[in-house]
Amino acid sequence: MPIQKRKPTSAGRRFVVSVVNPDLHKGAPYAPLLEKKSKSGGRNNNGRITTRHIGGGHKQHYRKIDFKRNKDGIPAKVERLEYDPNRTAHIALVCYADGERRYIIAPKGLKAGDFIESGDASAIKVGNTLPLRNVPVGSVIHCIELKPGKGAQLARSAGASVQLVAREGQYATLRLRSGEMRKVEVECRATLGEVSNSEHSLRSLGKAGAKRWRGVRPTVRGVAMNPVDHPHGGGEGRTSGGRHPVSPWGTPTKGYKTRSNKRTDKMIVRRRNKK
């Protein structure tokens, strides 16, 4: 996909770098697969902020994505590729032979007119979904289930992919982009190929307002606050915070381990690489 740098006709355009995909559908999305998406502004049912830096942004509809890919043995034709404001990857509208339409995460290289299918007997082809026990070792995959039938949870964002490196007994071993090696049941499903829109990481929004259009509010540094608001706040003049970095609630940050799901530790063969 071509990457466009804008002519600096204004300060807000000077640093804009956008990724343009001419193959994306330019009309409205498929209405029966849309859902209302209301904004919370980061507040809970008491009106209190539970997630900071959320608010405003353009109105959006949620696109119902088929993460389970459980319509087995029925081929589907890709009608078009679409932009989805709810995720970094592009999505594809597919029409099954029985007339049903669904949205799926579009893999890299998929285009309008292609055919895909799901199930044990599916061909080894980009866009097809099948259990890990039927995927050749060494294959690049995405949209992987962690529990059979639950729906895809791993490798769903733009450019994401995982490599199947081994299969032994009832478990398959996956190598994630982070360097982590993880075991997953062989009955879990995965889609062949990598996720589309891999150039997403090259874009630059160019100005603060573009972030506000996406519903992201400013992040204020702790050292710029008062002591009542943050452990790094206060002091005469500019300070460095005076202690190791912590969150507003005093939890160490910048590298502090917070993973507490011991139940699934046994599935991790090797921890991810340190950055």
UniProtKB/Swiss-Prot annotation:
Biological process per Gene Ontology, one example term: cytoplasmic translation
UniProt-listed Gene3D superfamilies: 2.30.30.30, Nucleic acid-binding proteins, Ribosomal protein L2, domain 3
UniProt keyword annotations, A-Z: Ribonucleoprotein, Ribosomal protein, RNA-binding, rRNA-binding
Transmembrane segments: none
Statement: the UniProt record of this protein carries the keyword Transcription: no
Highest taxon, organism lineage: Bacteria
Annotated stretches, region: Disordered: 34-59, 223-275
Assembly: Part of the 50S ribosomal subunit. Forms a bridge to the 30S subunit in the 70S ribosome.
Family, similarity comment: Belongs to the universal ribosomal protein uL2 family.
An example Gene Ontology molecular-function term: structural constituent of ribosome
PANTHER family: LARGE RIBOSOMAL SUBUNIT PROTEIN UL2M, RIBOSOMAL PROTEIN L2
Protein task: One of the primary rRNA binding proteins. Required for association of the 30S and 50S subunits to form the 70S ribosome, for tRNA binding and peptide bond formation. It has been suggested to have peptidyltransferase activity; this is somewhat controversial. Makes several contacts with the 16S rRNA in the 70S ribosome.
Gene Ontology cellular component annotations, sorted alphabetically: large ribosomal subunit
Protein name per the record: Large ribosomal subunit protein uL2
